[in-house]
UniProtKB/Swiss-Prot annotation:
Gene: recA
HAMAP family: RecA (MF_00268)
InterPro entries named in the record: AAA+_ATPase, DNA_recomb/repair_RecA, DNA_recomb/repair_RecA_CS, P-loop_NTPase, RecA-like_C, RecA-like_N, RecA_ATP-bd, RecA_C_sf
GO cellular component: cytosol
GO molecular function term, any single one: ATP-dependent DNA damage sensor activity
Keyword tags: ATP-binding, Cytoplasm, DNA damage, DNA recombination, DNA repair, DNA-binding, Nucleotide-binding, SOS response
Coiled-coil residue spans: none
TM helices/strands, residue ranges: none
Protein name: Protein RecA
Basic and acidic residues bias (residue ranges): 336-347
Annotated Pfam families: RecA, RecA_C
Primary residence: cytoplasm
Length: 355
């Protein structure tokens, strides 16, 4: 580029920085954080399927699927992982159905989980926006989009029609939220249900409530479905669950993670370590027997799960070797010094006031 054009460009950039603040325009190569940072999902199998070691920071994630498929369980595991790393988590319980006993069993620190049970959709999304713009929250979960009922619908009569109200609400909210989520480096997880379109003869009749905006704004979309029941004798103790990455802007999509979700316990970390360990030649399987480093751990998967629970050091060793081989690591919450945190808070507050 010749000198005259470069001078003109430099002048324009200086003017833009005066108007909109430093960093409003930059060269892509000047950005230090080129690799997408992430937070662990709490499952090694899912972290591997997501391609970047977990849910990307500063992005929107949608988790959807049929009833009782494990959507909330998957989201709660991510909250537990964030809290283990010293991060802050918030949960917008629009369904008014969060079970604190179950959440605690999954490893969630319920004493330090910020919970809101909004009266209507607008209130829930405004609370979510305030949390995001504070710059102090690392993950926020909205459960669920389908339960974010517009205020007009709640205050109206039963049987009144409100065409497209929820879709417009979500579209407006996501337009406001997307920029703030990126700047605050917060991961926003929206849980969604599925509905069936009427009169669809060909193709998939299933769709998700809340319009199309969430599909567009999401960097990652996960479809959670039960594959089969897990039994001990005649008793059903859990479900084999398939989690398909149907959209991924940060890694190749359409990968599938299969996990065991046990009733009252959540994702069986021992189960996925066994499965992945065998696949990656870290755990040896001969018939029904499983061995690690030449030592037999047990016969049958359930016995090996119990063995790993009783020997946490072996479980951790297998986990470390798997993450090293697959190139995935626990997402770390970046520690910010007080000045940086205060600057971000002021910036986000100013943005909030302007809008």
């Amino acid at each position: 580029m010749d000198n005259e054009r470069q001078k003109a460009l430099d002048t324009v950039i200086k003017n833009m920085e005066k108007s909109f603040g430093k960093g409003a325009v930059m060269k892509l190569g000047d950005n230090k954080a080129r690799r997408v940072s992430s937070i662990s999902s709490g499952s090694v199998t899912l972290d591997n399927a997501l391609g970047v070691g977990g849910y990307p920071k500063g992005r929107i994630v949608e988790i959807y699927g049929p009833e009782s498929s494990g959507k909330t369980t998957v989201a709660l595991h991510a909250i537990a992982e964030v809290q283990k790393q010293g991060g802050v988590a918030a949960f917008i319980d629009a369904e008014h159905a969060l079970d604190p006993v179950y959440a605690e069993a999954l490893g969630v620190d319920i004493d330090n989980l910020y919970l809101s049970q909004p009266d209507h959709g607008e209130q829930g999304l405004e609370i979510a926006e305030a949390f995001v713009r504070s710059g102090a929250v690392d993950i926020i979960v909205v459960d669920s989009v389908a339960a974010l009922t517009p205020k007009a619908e709640i205050e109206g009569e039963m049987g009144d029609t409100h065409v497209g109200l929820q879709a417009r609400l979500m579209s407006q909210a996501l337009r406001k939220l997307s920029g703030a989520i990126s700047k605050s480096n917060c991961t926003a997880v929206f849980i969604n249900q599925i509905r069936e379109k009427v009169g669809v003869m060909f193709g998939n009749p299933e769709t998700t409530p809340g319009g199309r905006a969430l599909k567009f704004y999401s960097s990652v979309r996960l479809e959670v479905r039960r594959a089969e029941q897990l039994k001990q004798g005649q008793e059903i103790v859990g479900n084999r669950t398939k989690i398909k990455v149907v959209k991924n802007k940060v890694a190749p999509p359409f990968r599938v993670a299969e996990v065991d979700i046990m009733y009252g316990q959540g994702i069986s970390k021992e189960g996925e370590l066994i499965d992945l360990g065998v696949e990656n030649d870290i755990v040896d399987k001969s018939g029904a027997w499983y061995s690690y480093n030449g030592d037999r751990m047990g016969q049958g998967k359930e016995n090996v799960k119990n063995y790993l629970k009783e020997h946490p050091e072996i479980k951790q060793d297998i986990d470390n070797k798997l993450r090293q081989k697959l190139g995935i690591f626990d997402g770390d919450i970046e520690e910010k010094d007080e000045k940086q945190a205060e600057a971000e808070k002021n910036e986000n507050t100013n943005l909030f006031d302007e809008e």
